Amino acid sequence: MPKMKSKSSAKKRFTVRAGGTIKRGQAFKRHILTKKTTKNKRHLRGSTEVAKADVKSIRSMLPYA
């Protein structure tokens, strides 16, 4: 059986942590930032965990992660 391919888009967006949780970056911080408050932009820094409902589909996109 041939190797399964990982989705390139998912490889760029998600990383699987040692505990099995999936890390993702925050959205809404690329442009149109003038109307957003400083507090709002500060909370969008860093990364967060993927929602439990989405984990199964992301794992299928990353078979070897």
Swiss-Prot record:
Gene3D superfamilies: 4.10.410.60. The keyword Nucleotide-binding does not apply. InterPro entries: Ribosomal_bL35 (IPR001706), Ribosomal_bL35-like (IPR021137), Ribosomal_bL35_CS (IPR018265), Ribosomal_bL35_sf (IPR037229). Pfam families: Ribosomal_L35p. Keywords: Ribonucleoprotein, Ribosomal protein. It comes from the Bacteria. Coiled coil: none annotated. Disulfide bonds: none annotated. GO terms for biological process: translation. The keyword Glycoprotein does not apply. GO terms for cellular component: cytosolic large ribosomal subunit. GO terms for molecular function: structural constituent of ribosome. Belongs to the bacterial ribosomal protein bL35 family. PANTHER family: 54S RIBOSOMAL PROTEIN BL35M, LARGE RIBOSOMAL SUBUNIT PROTEIN BL35M. NCBIfam families: rpmI_bact (TIGR00001). HAMAP family: Ribosomal_bL35 (MF_00514). This is Large ribosomal subunit protein bL35. It comes from Polynucleobacter asymbioticus (strain DSM 18221 / CIP 109841 / QLW-P1DMWA-1).
